[in-house]
Amino acid sequence: MSEPRWTRRKAQRPTELLAAALELFVERGYAATRLDDVAKRAGVSKGTVYLYFAGKEELFKAVVREGVVPVLKRGEKMVSGHTGTTAALIGDLMRGWWAAIGSTPYAGLIKLMVSECRNFPELGRFYSDEVITRGYQLVRKALQRGIDRGELRAIDPEYVSRLVFAPLVLAVIWRYSFDYCGVSQLDPSRYIEQHLEVLLSGLLAPSVAPSRARVRTAGTRA
């Protein structure tokens, strides 16, 4: 016997509230988003929001934990279980991040934090702990793997981990700023592939550099 419709609807409400909150946070920013508006966007009363979340800050944290953190978990598993070259791993991480975050509404949270973390330092620290620090850690692990295997030069993973994704973060910021002014954006796929070419030219050990074409995985144009 199937569940009553109202029961199924109730089970979906947290997801619907998170989706509405994400839309509004990206559209209006954190400061300008009100719980009344989130409730209206989700088609529920404001009181319903409080049944699931203590307030706007908890709602924001839930958006991050439900939508962004799982992507990091998948990235960590990818790094731990990868059996191919480190060049291919770095490429897979970049393409995977863009597909799961950079090309989705969750990318708007990056622009939001850049704009508003100064006024909301607690949220900034939360985002740094839950997302930024964890992201850099998995990239550092990938880089250290390459160094240990003799595939990468003896670079400093602490600093290079930040350089790896900096161009992608810039692409996201551009998307949520200049794109709205009619300034054209470069094709993301080509942008990522060109970044990989330049990055790996500097990272790969001399003995590996001639084979850097192996960075291209199945389905990627040569």
What are the residue ranges of the model-derived segments?
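Amphipathic, non-transmembrane alpha-helical scaffold segments
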Residues: 10, 18, 64, 90, ...
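Short helix-capping/turn signature of helix-turn-helix
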Residues: 53, 114-120, 130-131
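Short, basic, alpha-helical segments at the C-terminal edge of helix-turn-helix-like DNA-binding modules
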Residues: 65-71
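Amphipathic alpha-helical packing segments from all-alpha helical-bundle domains
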Residues: 88, 99-103, 108, 122-148, ...
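Hydrophobic/aromatic-rich alpha-helical bundle segments in the mid-to-C-terminal region
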Residues: 125, 147-196, 207-215, 222
